Structures are given as structure tokens and as C-alpha cells.
Amino acid sequence: MTTIERITTPRIRIFDTTLRDGEQSPGCSMSPPQKLVMARALDELGVDIIETGFPASSQSDRDAMALIGRELRRPSLSLAVLSRCLQADIETSARALEAAANPRLHVFLSTSPLHREHKLRMTREQVLESVRKHVSLARSYIDDVEFSAEDATRTELDYLIEVSRAAISAGATTINLPDTVGFTTPEEIREMFQQVIAGVADVPNAANVIFSAHCHNDLGLAVANSLAAIEGGARQVECTVNGIGERAGNCSLEEIAMVLKVRQAFYEQDSSINTPRIVGTSQLLQRLVGMPVQRNKAIVGANAFAHESGIHQHGMLRHRGTYEIMRPEDVGWEDSQMVLGRHSGRAAVEARLRALGFWLEEDELKLVFEQFKGLCEQQRVVTDADLQTLMQGGSNAQGYRLASMTISDVGSRANALVELSDPDGNRVAETAQGDGPVDALFGALSAATGVQLMLDSYHVHSVGIGADARGEANLSVRHEGVEYDGTGTSKDIIEASALAWLDVANRLLRQRQANAASTTEAPAPATA
């Protein structure tokens, strides 16, 4: 699809940065194989651009780009990487993009007076010269170049126009005006886009340039500001699944996509998002990074389509439109949960796993199906929660796995004995005492794995149907000052708690392995 075709189509381009900006959220880092799994889901979701990472920062991001580029070849999908306005960064990014069928090189530089003085220590003219030089360099490698004016919403309007003109003249095909610190308001950002677009109109090829919004959620306005930017002329929105990202996060992909769908008559724009895949994609990300969304999260929260008020329930029974502006099935929720059993075949199990966001290779599917049939011998039905439990057990295959545990009372205290299989298949056993079974359990797990976690919050609840219901444990912990979330599911809530603890511990161990494999010192995180 050409640039001219893109700009004349009444459609908003969805630039997903879950794998780059979203991953910068504390505790949300992903390994290259995990990024590939997430990228597959984003491809099925129908995003237009996937930003895979920041190649100059680590070998891990370069490996992820190579994996994703080799597999995802959809003609309408672009793969992007981020680069500072530095020659070495741009050259590294260009090499990383060699695997992509449709590459985009995304370069950024701060433009606000605060950043120019304290971060860059550069004058206005020096920033302009750097933009000209490095956008031109990027364009010499890649035809599709995006330039981001970091902290655009705190940049002088006349200077922002000047920088945008310079970037377009140097060959930029997309101009991104980020609200880097979530400072602006809808009225301000709408006016900013209108003024900048008008201010570059006479630059050659400006009519073919896409203007993009990248809004952070520090004041809770990321989605509202992105919509206002669309009203001001933006035709690309940069966002993340579940709104994850630095500090308070980014514009939420699922929210922006559903606003454009539900209120299409107002905005006269739509997106290419395959909306019935939204919930599955959201749940996949929650599992990969261990960060559940709050129950009242729009679109993907567990309560998004729940009605408890008697008045609301009565209205819903009369007509769904009384209290629902969209159907649950339009975003991937189901009115009734699909139930599998002993007579279900492998194709049905595979289809349900894909709907839940799990894409398995043939050998992986064979193993999970064998586990599924074993579960069918123990209970009448297998629900979505049961399938997620099976997949969670498989996710620990390369880390510590729970072999057995024993909890007993020792006077006023509890004693826990745990036996684990370590990543090499060896058995490790440790005991610990604590002020209750969970405290003792976590102490024993810490001793067995060598991982120290500080518990912030912990709760359990039931998932599943009737007598086959299982307990799900959710915990939030800290490790070296960074927050992590873990989830575990089992018939026994203490075992579920152990699985939740190991969920975090195994993720930390995988991160250590990925960091050890990296051969390049990481620069400061990008925030554009």
C-alpha cells in the first residue's frame, strides 16, 4: 500500500508499540520468543505497524526483530524499530530491519526547551541540523521513515512547525507529535495538530505525509488526547495493548479501536483492527508479562460487560441496547463459556487455545492435547480457565516446577516443605517457617530458588464451574525495587499460590538469562 493510498483512505493506522514502549513498563520485559508470540497475536489482530524494539539498546531486541521479521510477512504489515538521532543507532537499526518485508525506521529527538537545555544541551539550530542529518541518513537505508519530536506538546509551536518541515524535507514519511509526559489536554493537542499540519502544507510531498499521535496517560487523558489529535488531522495512533507503558502507560489499543468502531459516524474514521480478537490478545499479554488488568478496565476487564444492578439486569433482559453500547462478542467475550470434554478432538482444543491467545507449534499442541485428555479423566468438563492452567504449567517448563509440597503447623507457626525440579531437571528441597502457610511456603520457595521477593499484595478467588472450579492466586511482589505480578491456578489454593510465586521467579530467571546473552550496553530508555 502506497503512502498516497494510506492518506486518502478514511482509516486510522494503528501503530502498536507494546513490544517497545509497553515493554518499558516496570516488570513487563519480554524475551525474543515471547515477543514473537505477542507479535503473531498483533498480526492476527490486524495492526498496521508493530514496533518491535530498540535495536541499539540490546542484543535481545535485535534477536526479537530477526525472529519477527522472518515470520510475519503480511503485505499490509510494517515492522518498525526505534532509533535515536545517532549514526551508530541508525546503522544498527537498519541492519536489524533487513529481516522485515516492510521495514520502518523510527528516529526521534527531543524538541522542547526543557529537553534541549537539560537533556540534550543543544540549541534550536543544532536540533534542526541533527534532524536534517539523521532523517536523511535513515532515508538512505529505508524508504519508510518516521520522525518523532519527543516532548512535542511542550515545544514552542513555531519551532515544532520548523522541525516538522525539516524532517519532511529530509524524507520523513510520518511525523509523530508525542505527548511524552501526558501533559496536554484534548483542546490543546487538537489545535497543535491543526497548526502543524497547516504550517507544513507548502513543503514538497507534505500532502503524502501521515501525522501520528503518541499519548501517555499520566493525567488519564491518553485516549481522549489521541481522539482529539485525530480530530486535528492525525491519521496514525501509537498505542499499546492494555495501555501498558512507562509510568501510567500509553493510549490503550483496545479503547481507541472500539471508540472508532462504536462512534464511527462521529469520527468518520475506522481502523483495521479485527475486534473479536481484542480480548484474546489482551489476555495473552497479561500472561506473558504477569500484569493483570483491573476488573473494571474498559473493553477487556472482567466486569466490562457485567451487570449486577437489578434495574440494569431488567433492562438488559428487555433489550441489550439499554445498557450495552457494543456486544461482548464484538471484542472477543462470549455470552456463554465454551466447554470442552472427553469427546472433544484436537482441532477443537487448538481452536479454543487460539481464541484464548495461545498459538502452538505442532509438538507443543501434541503435548498440551495429551494433558487435556488426562484432565478429562479427572473432571467432566474442561473450561477456559482449565486450558489456561494447562498452558501456565507448560510455561514453567524451562524454569522451576513444583514437584510436591507439605504444609504443617508448628505451634503458633506454620512449616512448609517444598520440592522443586530446577531448570536442569534436578530436584531441590527446602523448608521454612512462617506466620501462616502462605508465608512459610514463600519462604521455602525463596530458599529453593535463591530468588528474593517482597510481597506487596496477595489474593485468591474461584474460577471455573461448580465442583470443577479451581482457585486462582494473584500476587504483586517487588524484586530489587521493581514490581512484578504473578498468577497461579490449581484445585488447591496453596498450590495455586506456589505457582503464582514461581510464575514471577521463572520470569526473573528468564530475564537474567536474556540479559546475560546481551553483548551491548543499553543506552537510556527511549520515551518518545
Swiss-Prot record:
Mn(2+) binds at D21, H214, H216, N250. Residues 12-279 form the Pyruvate carboxyltransferase domain. GO terms for molecular function: 2-isopropylmalate synthase activity; acetyl-CoA C-acetyltransferase activity; manganese ion binding. Signal peptide: none annotated. GO terms for cellular component: cytosol. Homodimer. HAMAP family: LeuA_type1. This is 2-isopropylmalate synthase.
